[in-house]
Structure formats: structure tokens, C-alpha cells
């Protein structure tokens, strides 16, 4: 049986652009691991134990195919409008303005942005998110 979720890995081309993006979301650098042909930068949110692994394959220039199986990662944010303003300063715009999914105000407002490699990130306003329990 699995005992602990360790990390989620995404492959990135431009580590500096990716670091700027994730740091704008509030992620902090936690570590780095180097190999001959690749290196990983580990990031996490200040009050969260989950880790995001950004993997750079040295010498790769072409964009990664995100594929049709991946949909998104989700993070809660304490000030969605403020975060979107900071991201806009970097030229990052949401797919569409914040909204309540399906008109469900009990869930709160969300929106989606894409990181520099096209990975979609769901931003959930309000700072907390309980796993939905619809019957």
C-alpha cells in the first residue's frame, strides 16, 4: 500500500520562466537534484507538504506535448484578484475571468491559467477547499 504522496512532476523547457510563474503563485524553491542529462527543481507552498518537481531535460528546445490526458493542477489562493493582477504584470492572463463553476457559489470562484509550458493551473479563491461531497 502507498504510504505518502511525494510529488507531481512537470517537464519544462525554460526553467527561469517556470520559476517566475510558480513563484508568482507563491511557491518557494525547496531543493534541486542534478543528473547528467536533466535536473529537477523542487518547489512547494509555504504551509503545504506537497511538492512540485520541475524537470528540465538539458538541450531540449521543442515544446512538450501536454497531451489530452492531463487536465490541471489546482491550488487555493488567498486573494484571487490580487494574484491575477500580479500574473498580468508578467503577461499571464486567465483563460476566462473568475467564475463560480456551474453557478455553485458554495464552491467559490475559480479560474485557470497556463504555465509557460502550457500546463493548466486551477486557482481556487478563498484559501481553503474542502473536497466536494455531493451525493
PLM feature spans:
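Short amphipathic alpha-helices within nucleic acid-binding modules
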Residues: 21, 80-86
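Vicinal oxygen chelate
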Residues: 32, 75, 84-135
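Exposed loop/turn and edge beta-strand positions of beta-sandwich/beta-sheet ligand-binding modules
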Residues: 37-39, 69, 107
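Core segments of cupin and vicinal oxygen chelate
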Residues: 2, 9-51
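Short, charged/polar surface micro-motifs in flexible loops or helix N-caps
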Residues: 47-51, 60-61, 78-82
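N-terminal beta-strand motif that seeds the catalytic metal site of vicinal oxygen chelate
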Residues: 1-17, 70-73, 124-135
